Amino acid sequence: MLNRLRQRSRDEGGFTLIELLVVILIIGILAAIAIPSFLNQKSKANDASAKELVRTAQTSAETISTDNSGSYATVTPAALNAVEKSIPIGKEPEGGGAWISAATGEATGYTVTATAGKSSGNTFTITNKEGVITRTCTVGGKGGCPLNEKW
């Protein structure tokens, strides 16, 4: 009985060093492919947040105009925040994300700019000049500015 157990323990084998190294190499290759992909996702998310935020600010600017007989002259970051409390202004919110970095108004139009978080740094701007609306993106880092700088 004891001899059988000894024989069985000699017959059992584990993984060889080569097999373990191949598995580690495969895991390393997969990580090298996946990690850069995941890191870029934060930049894309911050860009999407900035685009959504500048659209919200645009709606607030239109509300300000409606309240002021069609004039956009009082459009400022603080005025946008007074209309929509969820609009962060002036600096990046705690925990990261986008914020309204600039907002100016004239009688017949306005310009509102949102800056994506530090991982992207891109700025997204909506300008309304006498009813003609343009959207532009300025590259501040990596992320989602299209080639023609319009979004």
Regions found by a protein language model. Name each.
Residues 11-38:
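N-terminal single-pass transmembrane signal-anchor helix
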Residues 59-151:
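Periplasmic/extracellular, small/polar-rich flexible segments of pilin-like filament-forming proteins
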Residues 22, 34, 44-45, 61:
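Hydrophobic side chains within alpha-helical segments
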Residues 1-15:
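N-terminal leader/signal peptides at the extreme start of proteins
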Residues 37-54, 68:
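Aliphatic-rich helix starts adjacent to a transmembrane/signal segment
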